[in-house]
Amino acid sequence: MSTYLIGDIHGCYHELQSLLDQVQFNPETDQLWLTGDLVARGPDSLEVLRFVRALGNCVRLVLGNHDLHLLAVYAGIGRNKTKDRLSDLLEADDVDELINWLRRQPLIQVDEEKKLVMAHAGITPQWDIATAQACAREVEAVLGSDTYPLFLNAMYGDMPNSWSPELGGLARLRFSTNALTRMRYCFPNGQLDMIAKEPPDSAPPPLKPWFDIPGPVSRDYTIVFGHWASLEGKGTPEGIVGLDTGCCWGGNLSMLRWEDKQMFIQPSRREKQL
């Protein structure tokens, strides 16, 4: 049995299949961790969702910001942008089943035996592991409820950008969602910056990548994340693994085998755009 962790798929179904073929992935014995953003930008979001859902219990995934945006579009809240290439999915006969499955997926995965944590954007240095899990569960509970469109309608926005246990209501849910699915940079005190997207060597001071600010989780766990394609999987400290290598932008789809830390890559079918 092996555990494989794959970065943002973004509708790149054929690259996903080729990557799994490289290691002869066996859903009966192997486990597959996915960093989120299964959909959007790539050509085959529908096929990706159908495939991942059909894999069943061998998959441990987390939701990404593009997955959440899909839920909002489905609910009539977000805008279906042409560049996201979601129309085939939204018009599919099984879209209701796929959406109801997707919105019940977690925002964080933790394996205490492996001391492994996965979240789409990472873990804010303002949280310990218990807080990260509790905040993720709160968002998951709302997404899994019948009132999830009310949350999605209030999800968009950059504030609040600093964690406090006293945060409540939609503000608390928005902070947690941003920290788990959108974060890239933080101020030295751990406050989130939701504007900067450039590579770290071009970031305006005093901003730092979240993973360069020590926190309780990064001290005790390996953190695996996606979301930040321009990193190209490079530049993170030991114990922090970025797996989004921009497949939908003409980069690669990357996969880590946990047991021996071997990396596998599958080049994109598209020309490089990064």
Swiss-Prot record:
The keyword Hydrolase applies. Keywords: Hydrolase. Pfam families: Metallophos. Its EC number is 3.6.1.41. InterPro entries: ApaH, Calcineurin-like_PHP_ApaH, Metallo-depent_PP-like. One of its GO terms (molecular function) is bis(5'-nucleosyl)-tetraphosphatase (symmetrical) activity. The keyword Hydrolase applies. Belongs to the Ap4A hydrolase family. HAMAP family: ApaH. This is Bis(5'-nucleosyl)-tetraphosphatase, symmetrical. The gene is apaH.
